């Protein structure tokens, strides 16, 4: 029989819906329920952009989980910064999760207008961020 792994992003992506807000207590309760359901990975928030998520990860470490692994979410390092000196990546490490999810921009418009950097610098940010987190065993490529 094939094994199905579930990666749930309700606590991170679902919280971006209009009118949706989760308190730290809400998130802790939902984590327990998802674990009871056998969900393997729970992407629970972005500790680098939200103090409430940072508090959640600190408190969630105390919850004994049977099945689930918590996953922190965040972006690559900022332009001109080394990954080990970037506050956002530092918050992913400090979240204390077994894994993390990172995103990088790939649309030229975002690279130019949101990141305000070159394609080469953007690729460096992605490459070095992934290399740094992989060395800490927080991502698997």
Please name every model-derived segment:
Residues 14, 34, 100:
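Conserved, mostly hydrophobic/aromatic
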Residues 27, 53, 85, 122-126:
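Aromatic/hydrophobic pocket-lining residues that form the small-molecule binding cavity
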Residues 40-64, 73-77, 104-116:
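Glycine-rich, proline-tolerant flexible connector loops at the mouths of alpha/beta enzymes
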């Amino acid at each position: 029989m094939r094994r199905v792994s579930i990666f749930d992003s309700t606590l991170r992506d679902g919280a971006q819906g209009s009118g949706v807000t989760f308190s730290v207590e809400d998130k802790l309760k939902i984590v327990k329920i998802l674990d009871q359901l056998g969900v393997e990975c729970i992407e629970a928030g972005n500790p680098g952009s939200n103090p409430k998520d940072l508090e959640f990860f600190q408190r969630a470490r105390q919850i004994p989980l049977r099945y689930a692994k918590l996953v922190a979410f965040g972006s690559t390092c900022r332009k001109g910064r080394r990954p080990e000196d970037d506050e956002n990546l530092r918050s992913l490490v400090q979240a204390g999760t077994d894994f993390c999810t990172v995103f990088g921009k790939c649309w030229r418009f975002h690279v130019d207008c949101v990141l305000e950097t070159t394609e080469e610098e953007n690729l460096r940010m992605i490459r070095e961020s992934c290399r740094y987190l992989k060395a800490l065993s927080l991502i698997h490529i």
